[in-house]
Amino acid sequence: MDYLPLFADIRQRPVLVVGGGEVAARKVALLKKAGAIIKIVAKNIHPELQILQENHEIEWLAKSFSPEQLDHVFLVIAATNDSLLNQQIYQAAEQRHRLVNVVDDQQKCSFIFPSIVDRAPITLALSSAGTSPVLVRMLREKLEALLPQSLGKMAEIAGKWRPRIKEKLPAIKDRRLFWEKAFNGLFAHKVASGDWESAEKTLAEQLEKDNPKQGEIILVGAGPGDAGLLTLRGLQALQQADIVLYDYLVSPAVLEMIRRDAQKICVGKRAGHHSVAQEETNRRLIEWAQQGKKVVRLKGGDPFIFGRGGEELQAAKQASIPFQVVPGITAASGAAAYAGIPLTHRDYSQNVVFITGHCQKDGNGLDWATLARPHQTLVIYMGVMNAGKISEALIKHGRKADTPVAIIAHATLPNQQILNGRLDQLESLAKQAETPALLIIGEVGGLQSDLSWFSSKTDKEDTKSSLINLA
């Protein structure tokens, strides 16, 4: 171990910063967050420091450094570009046994700053002892993704309740089990939802009676396919799940992010055949949640856009099961972005409409006259099977036959397929398309050749998420 990790309490302790530039301003911001009394020595100070000085939040002690300035400080930071001055500060600090950090000169540091993940009062510090800053940054990125923002509030409430829990449960084993149950159960869910009053009520109820463990259902949008597009909240839910029920549309890369010992069950749905009836899926969700499991329902895209997520939550509500929703990037946004097709554009499309292509077999359930209006973009989910009927109806109601169209299959993935053409060619294009696929109809489709940027090479070699690399 090259450095001893310490967490220093510098609240109301004097800290000297020599230097007044941008680097010094960054160090001051960190010290200020930790509650230090900050003294600055510099000829001139950065505008951010000027504001702090005018507000009496820092003290501009002097314009030049002298060793005596170290006599009454806890630690010193040298943030200048003057190597001789930095050497002088380092030697003076060492002689007085003051902790010193010379920015970007590790040989003149008795301490170094770690990379920080801040969920106060939970704080994680990472360091490679200066050997690999990029690796530390990647590790921090992974931890930032895995640790929910609510973690700090959870710790704060837990600290408030510690004396009461200790009085009620004197045995350390009982207290450990109590907190494990709380941090993995309804209490954590309430804190994450921002319902702090209810979270404390849950702790009180858990303490006063031996409640059976209560599970919950988390509806998670997996996004359009690229695992890098999964939200941080979605990743956290997958890492906490006991059971995950997922659809065919969820990519293997996203499934790889599920906690290793979680049970994974495919309840896949595809146009034309349903492997598991919706009622059976609802029943399973409720049954496992009632057994105290944390059940994740993982859906491609966004669960509230043609995902039947509302139906599943209605069933959970009726069964009095706690639930939460983690939205995802819907297929329309992901497919269009990766294809280089802006869904709206000031010159071509003033609105965008999302519809499903198989809700009514005869097509009579849709207002084709409205859908056929010019200067709007239609995004059609599950429309490949009825592509001929769709193009016929739109042309019949006034949409021009030469309106650009695109069919995008396997959107955002290395095997993404894009078929471009005209509205009157939609049926023939659909016969060539792989599935699942999305239809985009509108003048914006004509921009695809100019704005296309994504390729399988781009995905594999340039933009692969470091979260996946470190998984």
From Swiss-Prot:
EC code(s) of this entry: 2.1.1.107, 1.3.1.76, 4.99.1.4
Region: Precorrin-2 dehydrogenase /sirohydrochlorin ferrochelatase, residue numbers: 1-203
CDD domains referenced in this protein's UniProt entry, alphabetically: SUMT (cd11642)
Annotated segments matching region Uroporphyrinogen-III C-methyltransferase: 215-471
Positions annotated to bind NAD(+): 22-23, 43-44
Xref: Pfam families: CysG_dimeriser (PF10414), NAD_binding_7 (PF13241), TP_methylase (PF00590)
Pathway assignment: Cofactor biosynthesis; adenosylcobalamin biosynthesis; precorrin-2 from uroporphyrinogen III: step 1/1; Cofactor biosynthesis; adenosylcobalamin biosynthesis; sirohydrochlorin from precorrin-2: step 1/1; Porphyrin-containing compound metabolism; siroheme biosynthesis; precorrin-2 from uroporphyrinogen III: step 1/1; Porphyrin-containing compound metabolism; siroheme biosynthesis; siroheme from sirohydrochlorin: step 1/1
Cited InterPro entries: 4pyrrol_Mease, 4pyrrol_Methylase_sf, 4pyrrole_Mease_sub1, 4pyrrole_Mease_sub2, CobA/CysG_C, NAD(P)-bd_dom_sf, Siro_Cobalamin_biosynth, Sirohaem_synt_dimer_dom_sf
In-chain residues carrying the UniProt-annotated modification Phosphoserine: 128
Catalytic site positions: 247, 269
Single GO BP term: methylation
Keywords, in A-Z order: Cobalamin biosynthesis, Lyase, Methyltransferase, Multifunctional enzyme, NAD, Oxidoreductase, Phosphoprotein, Porphyrin biosynthesis, S-adenosyl-L-methionine, Transferase
A single MF term (Gene Ontology): sirohydrochlorin ferrochelatase activity
Catalysed reactions listed for this entry: uroporphyrinogen III + 2 S-adenosyl-L-methionine = precorrin-2 + 2 S-adenosyl-L-homocysteine + H(+); precorrin-2 + NAD(+) = sirohydrochlorin + NADH + 2 H(+); siroheme + 2 H(+) = sirohydrochlorin + Fe(2+)
Binding-site list for S-adenosyl-L-methionine: 224, 300-302, 305, 330-331, 382, 411
Family, as annotated: In the N-terminal section; belongs to the precorrin-2 dehydrogenase / sirohydrochlorin ferrochelatase family. In the C-terminal section; belongs to the precorrin methyltransferase family.
Function text: Then it catalyzes the NAD-dependent ring dehydrogenation of precorrin-2 to yield sirohydrochlorin. Finally, it catalyzes the ferrochelation of sirohydrochlorin to yield siroheme.
HAMAP family, alphabetized: Siroheme_synth
Protein name (Swiss-Prot/TrEMBL): Siroheme synthase
The species this protein was found in: Zymomonas mobilis subsp. mobilis (strain ATCC 31821 / ZM4 / CP4)
